[in-house]
């Protein structure tokens, strides 16, 4: 079975609009074009399809095969290329819960479309991603519901007669689906191996994919906290795979901003080295639309063809205690910036028409009731005012912590240097303790034009001179090659 190495996603972190649409905000129809584009032009082998919000298109398989038939005859959906659905978590997103059932119910319909097109038995959709996974039951419920109700309904008889549903409208395939848990908070990531071990017990699995978030943990626990959580999870999943004999293929949800993963065409080698043990990396919108096309294609080819290195051992006991200390300092600083972040967030342009999935952050008790927008908007707001969020929390680290970070987070200085290209040292909102400690980590060399723009944005927002704020935010994002 081919496992994709790159997963294109619909994260709206891009500044520029893709060439195949005139819409500033991508619509559902645009996202069908986008799926074809990332397969055919960029070389991604997987597209994540977000099944939440009013603009969602449940007929994406039919549209792809009917509109781009020649391409998909040569590149088989479900064998060579993959479409993976991200569904609502009914435990968290109650108003979206029924969409989960609709989405699961659409999988056999998509199978029928592909079967008619290819005349074989490859399912075009056979994996789904469950966000905000926190327990074994949350992923097992989906697996069992699909087997018992979506597939099981075909054996029911109608009105007490001999006619089964399968005899009436045809058989239902595929017989089973694979559920990819997406772990987004500290407790989930630290329990990922335990949750999967339990999930493995009553199933005959030849492999398991698992998705580790990178953006939401950064917003919740800071840059270093997020990286260390990913590394602990990668190491524990490696041990789980060795112990059970079931290959585990981790996915890292990396964006272009250093705070959200620092995955760009020019950083693919160091990011894959940083996250040793990761099999698949997400290709988000800034990577696709804010970079040089040839460089993006070359970088994706590298990601698809590279040799996978095993996860590295990490002292998780010390790492967890460090994360708690660091996160406390980070959260204190971001709480103080929350009013400004929310003010700037109002001017961050939207890049997708649909309602995006909800996040864990914003009603988290450890943030003292402070409400913040989603990770991309938080990142965009802070960069726009010249305070890269990567610097927050550094002052909470001891000297031993710093040595541990330098040893286990290989490219921390490079990530901080990349981020601080967009630092405005003159910002009146930059915490004094950060100004004091930053020179111990890196040499600060801010981008002159971005520094001026961030100062103008800060001044305009604080003075409520809002006419040109969004334009300046877009100009600053264009310099960075990512919005947030």
Swiss-Prot record:
Keywords annotated in UniProt: Carbon dioxide fixation, Lyase, Magnesium
Top-level taxon of origin: Archaea
This protein's record includes keyword Secreted: no
Alphabetical list of Pfam families matching this protein: PEPcase_2
Alphabetical GO biological process terms: carbon fixation; oxaloacetate metabolic process; tricarboxylic acid cycle
InterPro entries: PEP_COase_arc-type, Pyrv/PenolPyrv_kinase-like_dom
Single GO MF descriptor: phosphoenolpyruvate carboxylase activity
Keyword Lyase: yes
Catalytic activity: oxaloacetate + phosphate = phosphoenolpyruvate + hydrogencarbonate
EC numbers for this chain: 4.1.1.31
Cofactor section: Mg(2+)
Family per similarity comment: Belongs to the PEPCase type 2 family.
Quaternary structure (record): Homotetramer.
NCBIfam families in the cross-refs: PEPCase_arch
Its job: Catalyzes the irreversible beta-carboxylation of phosphoenolpyruvate (PEP) to form oxaloacetate (OAA), a four-carbon dicarboxylic acid source for the tricarboxylic acid cycle.
The protein, known as: Phosphoenolpyruvate carboxylase
Organism: Methanospirillum hungatei JF-1 (strain ATCC 27890 / DSM 864 / NBRC 100397 / JF-1)
Gene (name only): ppcA
